[in-house]
Every structure is written in structure tokens, then in C-alpha cells.
Amino acid sequence: MDPYKHRPSSAFNSPFWTTNSGAPVWNNNSSLTVGPRGQYLLEDYHLVEKLANFDRERIPERVVHARGASAKGFFEVTHDISHLTCADFLRAPGVQTPVIVRFSTVIHERGSPETLRDPRGFAVKFYTREGNFDLVGNNFPVFFIRDGMKFPDMVHALKPNPKSHIQENWRILDFFSHHPESLHMFTFLFDDLGVPQDYRHMEGSGVNTYTLINKAGKAHYVKFHWKPTCGVKCLLEDEAIKVGGANHSHATQDLYDSIAAGNYPEWKLFIQTIDPDHEDKFDFDPLDVTKTWPEDILPLQPVGRLVLNKNIDNFFAENEQLAFCPAIVVPGIYYSDDKLLQTRIFSYSDTQRHRLGPNYLQLPANAPKCAHHNNHHEGFMNFMHRDEEINYFPSRYDPVRHAEMFPIPPAVCTGRREKCIIEKENNFKQPGERYRSWAADRQERFICRWVDALSDPRVTHEIRSIWISYWSQADKSVGQKLASLLNVRPSI
């Protein structure tokens, strides 16, 4: 039996209709009433159960990444990186690990069109022999902010107006006018890449900086990158309107239909690494999530391939109840002091416990496929069968022991307790370089999108001036074009 299908279930066992408790139901068409036109009777347990279950079908929507689609497959190592990490699932070329992947839009609600200009989530759960590894990323390699303290406010600004429930540019531009570090992210979001054609033709990135550790304990900072073998394709404005108007679930359907037809999506995994001893050699902070690592200095290194060859069996069980958390790592892969990553480590598991309950890791899509043992038990919706008598540690009656120690990055923590910004902000260099790397027509489309956003009637002269000033510092020509088209002088 498919491990995702847990008994008892009327969908797989009984040839006739039953209640949740297994009692036979001889009539699932009519309610129990006093005569053919009389009152309903509360003793109609099947009716009460049926309605009560229906009333509770919806669970809290994800606060971000609500709109998503999932698929299953495998990850296969193609290149040896055992000199960089002792992670078991990366131990040698040819090793395969089962995975489940969830793609998503970020800001908009469950059921919203998949053609909106929005970052896309790209989250991969590896079911390894040493536990699960969640690589929770996006399609863009950078992010809007570098400190998780700002995350709730950022999401509130990007979400619809709480009064009208309409997403509005003036709110977005007001918030980010206080955060010039967001410019680099906007060179992706307002670029042609802002609306992927579908999930199959989309890159992925781990976004945050992690740490690889080898058997000797040597650590390297690492960035993860997914490259689709079928290439990157995007939708321009008129194309997005046409596609979204015809099918608001076009990306979900494309993913499902492609896998069903045997046209399996595939991505190559690459990494970039930095020796922590060399992190001060750059004009940016390698742990700053608003920066990319230059590929001419830190080249992409091939690692493996991701193939999605099986559609999910049930959307609710394997998409809505599927839960990711950047804190879930395996020996050989660890966190870094990336400020945004440090806050994500707490926030993701916290929101899953709110959304799915304290035992969300027991759900089939989230549970490890390897043996596991601890004393975390009971609580709401605990359905793991346990018959042991020892639920404490240590005990002379239970032979369970500590696992063998694995290397983690050595760290000496010194410094004052303070709330501060990083030293190397350098907010404007990389956005300017990225803009200048584009062809003229691509630059023009980028400018037009900014003019459209800044033309919101509720965007004040002050906010327009600030944005023109920011873009002037990134690339003088961008500021000049925006100032001319908007008839605004930059405020520096």
C-alpha cells in the first residue's frame, strides 16, 4: 500500500458507505425526518457527522505561499562534493533520495491567479536516511529585507489593504522607501522574470546562506541554485492577462499534465561556496540575503539533478498539509548567521504548529521515512501508535542512546548585545550592475513597470523622489528616465 494512504479509510477499504466510526450507512441521500415533510431529527448521527466534518474542512491558510502546487520525485547526486559535506544523501554520485516539492506564489490567497507579478516559492523536502532536509527557497536568489524583524511589516505592506482588501502600490512603495536594500529584489520582481510562464520553466534558489561541513569539521558557506533543464520562460504583461484570463490555475495544471504525460520536469542543482576565513574579502557581506555571490568569482559547482516523476495523490494531504521549515537540516548541512535565516528557523515551525497542530510532523507528507525515536508525544491530533512504557531519558530499562556526534561549525560568539545594521550594506551596486546587464528593450520594460507603480495617485511626491534618488544611486540613467517620465526631481 502507498505509505501516504493510512487505514482506516472508506476510499480504500469498504465497498459500502460508512460513518467515520465504521458503522454502515444505508441511505446517504436523505435526512432522517418526522414524515416526508417533517422536522429534522438530531438523532440522525450520520447527517450531523457529515455536516460537522464539512464545516471543518478548511484549515488556516498559509499567511504567505498560500497558492501552491506539489509533485513528487527524486534527487540524484551527479557530482562528488564529499570533500565539502558529510551529508549522507550527498555521499557519492548515483545516490538517489525521494523528494516532494512545492511551488507557490507568495503574497496572494489560495486560489488566486498564477499569473500575478509575485515571487514564487520553490521548496524541496528530501527524505534522507538521516532524517528530512527542507530546502525552502524562492525563484529569486535575493530577498527584500535582510533582518527578520521587518518581515511581518513587509508582508503586511505587500498584502491587500486591510480596509479595502486591495493590493495597492502606494502601500508597497511607502514601506520599501524606508528600505533601500530592497532594490536588488525589485530588479528581479519588476524584471521580465516577475511572471514565470509556469513552474517547470522557473529557476529556484535556497536564497539564504547555509553552511556545509565535511567529516573533518571544515565548514564552507553555501548558496543553493536550481536550474531548469527546459530553460527559463516568462510571461509579459499582455501574455499574462491572456493566460490568466483563460485559466487562473495554468501553472498547477501545466505541472500536473506534464508529469501525467511522462514529460518529467527536471532541474540541475548547483552550489556556490565561500571559505568563512575569506568572507571579509568582498565588498558585500556573504550573509546578506539581499546580495548575490558573483559567479565570475564564485563559480557554480554542479551537484545533482531533481526529477519530478509522480503527481501527488491528494491535494489536501500533500499540498495543504505539506509543511516546510528551514530549521530541518541533516548532518553535514547547517545554518549560518544570516539574519533572515535565523528568524525563519523559528517562524516556519511556529506557523506550522498554528496551522496544522503540534504534531504536524506526524502527517505522512511531513514525517521522515527513516527510523526515528524521541519522547515527544501526546498533544492534539497525535495518531502515532506507541506502546512503550518508558517515555523519559535516560533509563536503564530502555537501551536507546545518543546518536553519534556529527560535526557542526565551530563558532566563538563575542560582541555587545545591540540592535544594529550590518556594516557592509552596499545597497546600490548590485542592482545597478544587474540593470546594465540587460538588453535595451528589457531595460525599457523595467522602467515602464516602475513608472506604472510610481504613478499610483496616492504615492506622494516625497516617495517618488526617494525612489528616483535610490535608482539614481544604482544607475544614473534609471533615475534620469524615471524623473523625466514622472516629472519629478530626485531627492538626495
UniProtKB/Swiss-Prot annotation:
GO terms for cellular component: cytoplasm; glyoxysome; nucleus; peroxisome; plasma membrane. One of its GO terms (molecular function) is metal ion binding. The active site is at residues 65, 138. Its cofactor is heme. InterPro entries: Catalase, Catalase_AS, Catalase_clade1/3, Catalase_core, Catalase_haem_BS, Catalase_immune_responsive, Catalase_sf. The gene is CAT1. It is an enzyme of class 1 (oxidoreductase). Keywords: Heme, Hydrogen peroxide, Iron, Metal-binding, Oxidoreductase, Peroxidase, Peroxisome. Belongs to the catalase family. This is Catalase isozyme 1. Occurs in almost all aerobically respiring organisms and serves to protect cells from the toxic effects of hydrogen peroxide. It is found in: Peroxisome. The lineage of its organism: Eukaryota, Viridiplantae, Streptophyta, Embryophyta, Tracheophyta. It comes from Gossypium hirsutum (Upland cotton). Homotetramer. SUPFAM superfamilies: Heme-dependent catalase-like. It catalyses: 2 H2O2 = O2 + 2 H2O. Pfam families: Catalase (PF00199), Catalase-rel (PF06628).
